[in-house]
From Swiss-Prot:
It comes from the Bacteria. One of its GO terms (biological process) is ribosomal small subunit assembly. GO terms for cellular component: cytosol. PANTHER family: RIBOSOME MATURATION FACTOR RIMP (PTHR33867:SF1). Pfam families: RimP_N. Coiled coil: none annotated. Keywords: Cytoplasm, Ribosome biogenesis. Gene3D superfamilies: Ribosome maturation factor RimP, C-terminal domain, RimP-like superfamily, N-terminal. Belongs to the RimP family. It comes from Prochlorococcus marinus (strain MIT 9215). InterPro entries: Ribosome_maturation_RimP, RimP_C_sf, RimP_N, RimP_N_sf. Required for maturation of 30S ribosomal subunits. It is found in: Cytoplasm. This is Ribosome maturation factor RimP.
């Protein structure tokens, strides 16, 4: 019964989200809490960042939809939030924002025996990624890079 109601609720909330140019990434209903906690993770359909105001604006129509559906027959707390920041760096904005931060570079191993390199993000160009590894700048061609993620450096 719980799963069926959750699925129905998810369908209703996705319709509401579409009206606000939002997409629901996940809905988590924590019935082990008192009151029950309904957590909804949203993102914008155009890819822009979610603001606190976006979450607040979506709260009222989401709450209204939950109330009108009568699918939750208990008191609950509604939490609307964004996915947060991804650890993976993909956009030029990411590379500018996190310059100097520790990164983990996953390599494709075509030309290297190493799977990963760790260092501080130094520079990104169209052709290569440069990281600072213990004071030495290492340029890695992008055709050798699978993934670049934020990490914590260990000595």
């Amino acid at each position: 019964m719980y799963k069926e109601n959750k699925n129905k609720l998810e369908i209703l909330l996705k319709k509401v989200a579409n009206e606000w140019d939002l997409k629901i990434c996940s809905i988590n209903i924590q019935t082990n809490q008192n009151p029950t906690v309904v957590k909804i993770i949203i993102k914008k359909t155009n890819g822009d960042d979610i603001s606190l105001e976006d979450c607040a604006l979506f709260n009222a129509p989401a709450s209204e939809e939950i109330e009108n559906s009568n699918l939750l027959n208990c008191s609950y707390v509604l939490e609307i939030s964004s996915q947060g920041v991804s650890d993976e760096l993909t956009s030029d904005r990411d590379f500018k924002t996190f310059k100097g931060f520790p990164v983990n570079v996953q390599l494709n191993q075509k030309n290297s025996k190493k799977k990963f390199l760790n260092g501080l993000l130094y520079e990104k160009s169209n052709d290569y990624l440069a990281i600072n590894i213990k004071g030495k700048i290492k340029k890695i061609p992008f055709d050798e890079v699978l993934k670049i993620s934020l990490c914590t450096l260990k000595d």
